[in-house]
């Protein structure tokens, strides 16, 4: 029984690799005409929904408000600020002297900041870190929609646009609506469909 389970896993991994190989080797017109536009829509529609919400609520850059509830304001933003300084100044990620008598920054980095997307904050000025965090939420929700579309399409072997609709529901689910301010957990939601 373990051999058949192993063979099935190998076949699934091979299909997954072939899927990505085909996406990146086809020319753009063939990609769009083959029904794969649903992947683009899976990413773009949540972004557009967030943009509309940001406009309605006046959240930066469409207004002067920020989305900073609870721990995102009091805890996460200072962590991201410290990460920004460490990246920009080439400082060590192991220890920080910038809070109290100093502390183990590697533990903070491992739990809160280790997502590769978080390093993008170093591309922006320090004073807009809260705005960048708002847009990281948007990006991670869009990635969650995209990965769920990939999973549903491959698992059910379909090119139906309904997979995109379900994936958008996943990316804009009640859990994400309530807890999207926990930026570090959004990565788990984004990669869960690929596991």
Predicted region positions:
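Membrane-water interface of alpha-helical transmembrane segments
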Residues: 32-40, 101-104, 130, 134-137, ...
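Membrane-interface coil-to-helix junctions
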Residues: 49-148, 168-190
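Transmembrane-helix signature of polytopic, membrane-embedded enzymes
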Residues: 149-171
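Membrane-interface transmembrane helices that cradle and orient dolichyl/undecaprenyl
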Residues: 195
């Amino acid at each position: 029984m373990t051999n058949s389970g192993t063979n099935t896993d190998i076949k699934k991994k091979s299909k997954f690799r072939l899927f990505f190989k085909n996406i990146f080797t086809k020319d753009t017109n063939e990609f769009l005409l083959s029904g794969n536009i649903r992947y683009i829509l899976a990413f773009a529609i949540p972004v557009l929904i967030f943009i509309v919400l940001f406009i309605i609520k006046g959240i930066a850059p469409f207004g002067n408000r920020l989305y900073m509830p609870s721990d995102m304001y009091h805890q996460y933003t200072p962590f991201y600020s410290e990460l920004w300084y460490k990246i920009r100044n080439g400082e060590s990620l192991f220890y920080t002297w910038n809070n109290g008598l100093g502390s183990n920054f590697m533990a903070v980095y491992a739990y809160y900041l280790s997502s590769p997307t978080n390093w993008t904050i170093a591309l922006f000025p320090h004073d807009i870190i809260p705005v960048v965090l708002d847009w990281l939420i948007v990006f991670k929700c869009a990635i969650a929609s995209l990965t769920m579309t990939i999973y549903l399409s491959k698992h059910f072997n379909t090119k139906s646009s309904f997979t995109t609709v379900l994936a958008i529901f996943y990316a804009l689910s009640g859990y994400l609506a309530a807890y999207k301010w926990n930026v570090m957990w959004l990565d788990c939601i984004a990669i869960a469909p690929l596991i």
